[in-house]
Amino acid sequence: MTPFRRKQLVGIAGALPACVLAALTLDHAGDLFGFVALPADDPSSRLAFALRWMLLPGFCLLLGVVVAGRRGFVADAIDGTREPASHGLEITLRYNQNTLEQTLLAGIAWANLAINLPIAHLVLIPAMATLFAIGRGAFWVGYLIYPTGRAFGMVLAALPTIASYAWVAWRAYCGWAE
């Protein structure tokens, strides 16, 4: 087996449990997140609900920025180069870039879900926010351990967003009636 094939298999081995966990969490979101107070059934309340849950991705990004900022004052990173000598700082910068991208994509998806989901299904947004936060943490820790170790966290954070885009696109462009 080639080293490349081995890395692919390790990535798949990390991604599969994330797929199962995401599917189970979203399937049982009503039970797991039944304690969450749903908003009034009007567009502004729905969007405010989604925005409040965007704090979890925001905190993930803020944590990465704070860690990178603190690491920027150590001797091997004080010059501010894009490729610092510190492996940990380089991974943190990559985490921040990817978290920024994922946060933007999630925000667009969740705003669309907030407007289009039936009110009882809005509980999916807190479920996705929780998966996002756990996934970003697992991505960061896994990446620090070994690059292919980031697969579980990447899939756990990204899969609900991808599914959201698919559902919203289907609804918007295929004329799925209410």
Regions found by a protein language model. Give the residues of each.
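Juxtamembrane boundary at the C-terminal end of a transmembrane helix
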Residues: 166-178
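Interfacial loop-to-transmembrane junctions
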Residues: 6-7, 138-163
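Small-residue-rich segments of transmembrane alpha-helices in multi-pass membrane proteins
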Residues: 17-20, 87-90, 153-168
